[in-house]
Amino acid sequence: MNLILELLLLVGIIIYSYLESLVKFFIPQRRKSVAGQTVLITGAGHGIGRLTAYEFAKQKSRLVLWDISKHGVEETAAKCRKLGAVVHVFVVDCSNRAEIYKSVDQVKKEVGDIEIVVNNAGAIYPADLLSTKDEEITKTFEVNILGHFWIIKALLPSMLRRNSGHIVTVASVCGHRVIPYLIPYCSSKFAAVGFHRALTAELDTLGKTGIKTSCLCPVFVNTGFTKNPSTRLWPVLEPDEVARSLIDGILTNKKMIFVPSYINISLIVEMFFPERVLKAINRIQNIQFEAIVGHRTKRK
C-alpha cells in the first residue's frame, strides 16, 4: 500500500475513532462479567486497594489480596468475605523483587492463574528534593514502578498462553502533570503511565488482543498518605469514589481512567498553553498539602 492510501486510511481511522467515542459517551457501554475470575490486588490493606477489593467482591470475583500490613489486609479480607467473596491473603513487600517472585509462585500453587491484576501498591514522601532521603527516593521507585515490572513479568506468561487477562496500572494525574514537592512521586507515576502505554502497544504488536490493559489516573485522593490536601480547581476525592470509577473502567475495558473524567480534557487543552499560562494555572489552582521543606514540615 502506498503512502497516500495509508494516509487516507489513517484519516478514516481518526474519524471513526472520534465517532465511536461520541457514541460511547451517550450510550452506556456493555460491561463484562468478572464473576469467578481470580483478581490480584496489591496494596489492598488501605485506601483505593481496599475499596477496589470490596467492589470486586460485590462482582463475585475470587480475590488474592497483597499488602505489607498484615493487620490492614486481614481487615480488608474480612469485609470481602462478608460480601461473599473467596479471599486469599498474602503479606508482601512490593518493593522487594525476590519476595514478589516468591509470592507469585505461592499464589500459583495455592490459588492458580491470576486473570486480573491491579498494581495499586504505592509510596509517597511529600518533601522538596533536598529534604527527601535517598532511601525514600529508592523506595518510591521500587514500589510505584519497579514492582509493576516484577509482578507483570511473573504473571504475563500465563496470560499470553491463554490470550486472556486484564492488567491494571494505578498511576495518577501526577503521571501527566507535575506538582512541586513531589518530584520522586511524579517521576514514578510518569514511569507508570509510560509502562502502561508501552505494555499496551507491545501486546497489540504481539496480537494478544485478549489481554486488556487499563491505567487509573485520579487527582488527589484522601487516603491519608498526603496530609491535609486541598485545591481550588480539582476536588479531593474519596477512595470509594475512585474505586467505583476504576471498577467501571475495568468492566468496560477502558484504557485510561481519569477521575474525575473531565481531567482528560483539561490535560489535552493544557498541551497547547505556553509555560507562562501553565504557571498562572498552577497559582490559581493553589494545591496545598503538608510537606517537608528545608527539613521542616510546612503546608505547601
Curated annotation (Swiss-Prot):
GO BP annotation list: lipid metabolic process; positive regulation of lipid biosynthetic process
Binding site for substrate: 172
Residue positions binding NAD(+): 40-67, 189
CDD domains from the UniProt entry: 17beta-HSDXI-like_SDR_c
Recorded GO CC terms: endoplasmic reticulum; lipid droplet
Keywords linked to the UniProt accession: Acetylation, Endoplasmic reticulum, Lipid droplet, Lipid metabolism, NADP, Oxidoreductase, Phosphoprotein, Signal
Pfam family, one: adh_short
E.C. numbers: 1.1.1.-, 1.1.1.62, 1.1.1.105
InterPro entries named in the record: NAD(P)-bd_dom_sf, SDR_fam
Leader sequence segment: 1-19
List of residues that carry Phosphoserine: 33, 69
Active site, renumbered: 185
Chemical reaction(s) catalysed: 17beta-estradiol + NAD(+) = estrone + NADH + H(+); all-trans-retinol + NAD(+) = all-trans-retinal + NADH + H(+); all-trans-retinal + NAD(+) + H2O = all-trans-retinoate + NADH + 2 H(+)
PTM sites of type N6-acetyllysine: 79
Gene Ontology MF terms: all-trans-retinol dehydrogenase (NAD+) activity; estradiol 17-beta-dehydrogenase [NAD(P)+] activity; oxidoreductase activity, acting on the CH-OH group of donors, NAD or NADP as acceptor; steroid dehydrogenase activity
EC class name: oxidoreductase
Location in the cell: Lipid droplet; Endoplasmic reticulum
Sequence similarity: Belongs to the short-chain dehydrogenases/reductases (SDR) family.
Task of the protein: Plays a pivotal role in hepatic lipid metabolism. In vitro, it catalyzes the oxidation of a variety of lipid substrates, including 17beta-estradiol, retinol, retinal, and leukotriene B4.
Protein name per the record: 17-beta-hydroxysteroid dehydrogenase 13
Phylogenetic classification of the source organism: Eukaryota, Metazoa, Chordata, Craniata, Vertebrata
Gene that produces this protein: Hsd17b13
